[in-house]
Amino acid sequence: MKNMWLLGLIILLPPLSSFAQHNDFGLGVIIGEPTGLSWKIWAGGKNALAGAAAWSLGRTDAFHLHADYLFHNFRLFPVSKGRLPFYYGLGVRFLFHENGEESTKVGVRFPLGIEYIFATSSLGIFIEIVPILDLSPGTDFDLNAAIGFRFYF
């Protein structure tokens, strides 16, 4: 499984970090379903790419990789300090089962969440719920939910 973590980092992080501007790349932790490392890179004022390399600890232990394209609405929840965008998007999830008894699952993600980005620091905290439509090896519905934080640099 250590090789899967390395593969996830090799696939997801380096190509994205080349697009990052100052304070546009965030790296942190996601806790829930799944639990692991989370990243986000802003791709303009209201859009971002986000993802995780994590463990899915639900019904079966599995290594989880996902990447999402996100749209942000900064006006829905106005705050006096910092920023609190609502976000939604579309992404992909790969689920590699540890026991080898089940096939690798590939699904489409529909993330919904909010992230508070502090005005005085480079920290963002988020909560999200994500309906997932697995397409391979068979069609199935799943639901992920998590909280997390990222440091932006």
Residue ranges and their predicted role:
Residues V79-A119:
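Mid-chain, well-packed structural core segment of small domains
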